[in-house]
Every structure is written in structure tokens, then in C-alpha cells.
Amino acid sequence: MLCTSPVNCLDSVCCTSINISSLVRRAALTHNDNHFNYEKTHNFKVHTFRGPHWCEYCANFMWGLIAQGVRCSDCGLNVHKQCSKHVPNDCQPDLKRIKKVYCCDLTTLVKAHNTQRPMVVDICIREIEARGLKSEGLYRVSGFTEHIEDVKMAFDRDGEKADISANIYPDINIITGALKLYFRDLPIPIITYDTYTKFIEAAKISNADERLEAVHEVLMLLPPAHYETLRYLMIHLKKVTMNEKDNLMNAENLGIVFGPTLMRPPEDSTLTTLHDMRYQKLIVQILIENEDVLF
């Protein structure tokens, strides 16, 4: 038997049954059928359980009256605090726990929906490429803020069923604005805090070939969901530059727009941000111009 019952009213059959249930659930989480196989750490928070609970990692009883263990707020996994240090990065978020699309961790969102990229990115880019590639000042011209907020609320409310068609939003700048807002609202930027400094250092390399190689090496450090989303965005932005005659947007212009959107320094420093802006622009410009080589 895997545990000893803490109270007389719980017989050994009940205890064993609960333990087996925990182990089955743990196995299901470990061997989930997520085709894209993105790793995600659990988002554990101290939790007070009502009634008897067993750790879903070690299968032992969680003793105490308050704060007996921790629960993952994304998938609901319950474990001892000390066991949480050993749980693998196999969080499979439950859609019921994902309350919104914007401001949600990117990997959490794609794992919950079992998609390669956030649906916002796919849907907005499809709409922009269908009717906006020749629009002058694409991504540089801003749409009405309240309409952009409407699109955000539509995605948060309706998910992939959100209607952003020309019938509802004829101004394509509203859709580009909603896409940029999604990237700005990410708690961890597309180009993560962990890789930010390395990208900036790569941008400072004077030799073009060495700089490209350095950028490629740092790209490999991005989490898979971030890498895939960035790759898809750069392919799209390359298409935007191919219509420069009409939209007047080249890779440098897009770098100015997307640099601060995709890259944020780990420390919230105005001086750092101002100092790094030219390197942020350059990184995005390099990614666009060399997307076929870098990705």
C-alpha cells in the first residue's frame, strides 16, 4: 500500500484508490499527446485543501490544516511544496483555467489550445495578408484605440471564433494594432528576458556574418513556442516588405515599430530602453531580412 490513512473513516481501499487515481493522472500529464511537445513549467502557488488530499507526485498524504501543499494554477496539479521542486516541466494547462487570451503566458496559451502559435497571431496575420499588405504605413499607422480594445475583448471572450472581418473592422490598422497589443501585453516578451541581453550583444557585432551567426545562436535559446511564433511573424513581415512600393514599409521601418514590441529589457529602466532602441530595431530588421536563413 502506498500510504497510511490519516483518519479512521478512510479505509485502505479508499486510500489505495485515491493514490492510483493520482498516479494515473500524473502519468497522463507526463505522456500527454500534445503534438507540438512544448515544455512548460508548472505555476505552483501555496494552497489550503479542504478535506483529505494526496500528493500527485509522491502519492503520500498532505498533512496539516492549512497550506498543506501547492497547486498549479494552470493545470490544477496538487503536490507537496518539497515535491514541486522535482515535478518535470510537463504542465498541460486546462482551458477552463485560462480566463483570457491577452496577457496570458504564450506557452501556457498554446499548450492549453494544443496549437503551434497563439490563435491571435494566426488569425490577425491571415486577415492582414488577405486585405492589407498594400495598405500605406502598414503597422506604422495606428487604428482607433477603442476599436483595438474591442478586438482584444472579442478574442478574450470568443477565442478563435472572434470575428475580425472587414464587415466588422474595415480599417486594417485596427487589426495590426490588435496584433501589436497582443505582443506588448505578453507577460514574457516574444524575445524573452533571458535572451534579451544576448540579442543586444549580438546586434553590437560589427562584422555582418559574425553578427548573423550570433543572432542565430541566440534564437536557438528561445522557448519553442516563442521561437515558432517569432518565425511565423518574420515570414509575415518579410511579405510586408515585398509590398514596399505600395505600403512604404521596409525592414528598417518595421524594425522601428516592432523592436520595442518584441523586446523588453529585464529591468524596467527608461535609460536602458532608450539606449537599446537602435539595437532592438536592428535585431528585428536582421530577422526580417534573413528569415529564410535564420529560421
UniProtKB/Swiss-Prot annotation:
Regulation of activity: In the inactive state, the N terminus protrudes into the active site of the Rho-GAP domain, sterically blocking Rac binding. Phospholipid binding to the Phorbol-ester/DAG-type zinc-finger/C1 domain triggers the cooperative dissociation of these interactions, allowing the N-terminus to move out of the active site and thereby activating the enzyme.
SUPFAM superfamilies, per the entry: Cysteine-rich domain, GTPase activation domain, GAP
Signal peptide from the UniProt entry: none
UniProt cross-references to InterPro entries, sorted A to Z: C1-like_sf, DAG/PE-bd, PE/DAG-bd, Rho-type_GAP, Rho_GTPase_activation_prot, RhoGAP_chimaerin, RhoGAP_dom
Family annotation (PROSITE patterns): RHOGAP, ZF_DAG_PE_1, ZF_DAG_PE_2
Highest taxon above the source species: Eukaryota
GO biological process: acrosome assembly; signal transduction
Gene giving rise to this polypeptide: Chn2
Cell location: Membrane
Pfam families in the cross-refs: C1_1, RhoGAP
SMART domains the UniProt entry points to: C1, RhoGAP
Protein task: GTPase-activating protein for p21-rac.
Name of the protein: Beta-chimaerin
Phorbol-ester/DAG-type zinc-finger residues: 41-91
Keyword presence, Oxidoreductase: no
Alphabetical keyword list: GTPase activation, Membrane, Metal-binding, SH2 domain, Zinc, Zinc-finger
Zinc is among the record's keywords: yes
GO cellular component: membrane; synapse
CDD domains, alphabetized: RhoGAP_chimaerin
